[in-house]
Amino acid sequence: MPQVTMRQMLEAGVHFGHQTRYRHPKMSPNIFGARGKIHIINLEKTVPLFNDAMNFLSAVAQKRGSVLFVGTKRSARDAIKEEAERCGMPYMIQRWLGGTLTNFRTVKQSVARLKELELAETDGTFSKLVKHEVLRLRRESGKLQASLGGIKDMNRIPDAIFVIDIGHEDIAIKEAKKLGIPVVAVVDTNYDPSLVDYPIPGNDDAIRAVQLYARAAADAVLEGKAAMPNAVAVREEEFASAPDAGKKGRQAQPKKGKRASDAAAE
């Protein structure tokens, strides 16, 4: 599991919450106090919850599951994209398209169209078209890439989603809950932590804090992948031992045309 210390959280500003007037009652147990009009999050509560969330993501990856990284707010886009790509997981950094999860079949059709356009540009198809048609198709491809590029290799519903801001990504969370997909999410002082399965009390606005969360989530996924059962090695070991087993089996057989008793006497 990726080790993130309380000092690292302090340096990243994880402990700074929202203004006190926006406090959600269910976040009260995770609030240490207030500085001026800003709530201070109790990192002694955050650390164990953070560790639980990272352990869960690692377990999902270890079972060959997929985690969808979601961060469509401006302060989260770069970190989410970079870390999701680093650990080989799908991501959504532009506006969440309604039905991305609940109407996945239709989304896959749009993804197929994106791949078709990408292939057409590389295989010489565009060179056979008139200029204005090429421009139109490139605009279409650009729009699809912006909205679906991060999930174009996601061939099925994810096994979990990792979210930076549950208020900003409320539609994604509703869709995940409807389908029974576990949600790991950073929850600031102005939101209800009971809306997600693995809440991480923390600042959901500061870029350094977002980078810390995303990097830790990617590290957890990579650790899970590294701990996957190596099925290939097991099969190779079985294959290597197979000839010996076969040899013993052949030795046990009597020679053709002889009775078993004669073979035993020899």
Curated annotation (Swiss-Prot):
<dbReference type="InterPro" id="IPR018130">
    <property type="entry name" value="Ribosomal_uS2_CS"/>
</dbReference>
<dbReference type="InterPro" id="IPR001865">
    <property type="entry name" value="Ribosomal_uS2"/>
</dbReference>
<comment type="similarity">
    <text>Belongs to the universal ribosomal protein uS2 family.</text>
</comment>
<keyword id="KW-0689">Ribosomal protein</keyword>
<feature type="region of interest" description="Disordered">
    <location>
        <begin position="238"/>
        <end position="266"/>
    </location>
</feature>
<protein>
    <recommendedName>
        <fullName>Small ribosomal subunit protein uS2</fullName>
    </recommendedName>
</protein>
<dbReference type="GO" id="GO:0003735">
    <property type="term" value="F:structural constituent of ribosome"/>
</dbReference>
<feature type="compositionally biased region" description="Basic residues">
    <location>
        <begin position="248"/>
        <end position="258"/>
    </location>
</feature>
<keyword id="KW-0687">Ribonucleoprotein</keyword>
<dbReference type="InterPro" id="IPR023591">
    <property type="entry name" value="Ribosomal_uS2_flav_dom_sf"/>
</dbReference>
<dbReference type="InterPro" id="IPR005706">
    <property type="entry name" value="Ribosomal_uS2_bac/mit/plastid"/>
</dbReference>
<dbReference type="GO" id="GO:0022627">
    <property type="term" value="C:cytosolic small ribosomal subunit"/>
</dbReference>
<dbReference type="GO" id="GO:0006412">
    <property type="term" value="P:translation"/>
</dbReference>
<dbReference type="Pfam" id="PF00318">
    <property type="entry name" value="Ribosomal_S2"/>
</dbReference>
